[in-house]
Amino acid sequence: GQAPYDIVFGFSNFINDWRQYLAPVPKKYMNSTEMKDVTKSHVGVSSWDGTMYQYPVDGDRHYLKYRKDVIDNPEMQKKYKADTGKTLKVPTTWKEYGEMAKYFNGWDWDGDGEKEYGSAEVMKKDDLMFAAFFSRSVAYAKNPRTPGGFFFDLETMKPNINNPGFVEALGDWVEATKYVPPGGINFGLGDEIGSFGGGQTLFSFSWDDAFIAAMQDDS
């Protein structure tokens, strides 16, 4: 019969299931002005086997947010070096993130008269915790040294959730419960936004909302 819809809006992770019903994106749209600054990675997730089936509208990226007044502070850098023997800088691994978050957890390091904490994260069950866990696990389970699928083995479709990468990430996340604010293990996205955006933590990672909140005059 006749297809009831001309356009379908949905997540790119369903693209292989949907593509039998979809027409490739017309070249005039692929070459449009709006597409000029779309990154190759976002074009890639909108495509299957080299053919673009979806037109990206939301990058949906996770960002690392950090307190510049701490990380870039020479006095804090000196203190951190003296106490830990390590360099205080923007972390590039989850291990560095955890070490710094743990060090800055539970004391008033910005002089506002209140305790600050290491990290605000979405940890609430049945909320968006799955997305937060993927950000942690992808560094171990999907990188140039771990080719193939992320969720499944591409040859056998065996779930990868119990592989060393996911297990390592889960261990990190259990450790992270020690450097979040009180009640942090029940933080949903709104709580994470309010916590980092309100100046309560050194780090957070998720979408850009908490960064925007941190830029407000009352933060």
Residue ranges and their predicted role:
Residues D112:
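Acidic carboxylate motifs that coordinate Ca2+ or other divalent cations, activating on Asp/Glu
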Residues V45-S46, G50, D69-V70, P74, ...:
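Extracytoplasmic/periplasmic substrate-recognition and gating elements
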Residues E96-Y103, A132, R136-N186:
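Glycine-centered hinge/linker elements that transmit conformational signals in sensory
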Residues I161-S219:
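Ligand-binding pocket segment of bilobal, Venus flytrap-like solute-binding proteins
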Residues G10-K65, D72, A132:
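Hinge/lid segment of periplasmic solute-binding proteins
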Residues G1-P4, I71, E96-F104, G190-S204:
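Short helices/loops that flank or line small-molecule/ion binding pockets
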Residues K27-V38, K78-V90, W109, K124, ...:
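Short, solvent-exposed loop/beta-turn-alpha elements that line the ligand-binding surface or hinge
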Residues G1-N13:
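Early extracytoplasmic/lumenal segment of secretory-pathway proteins
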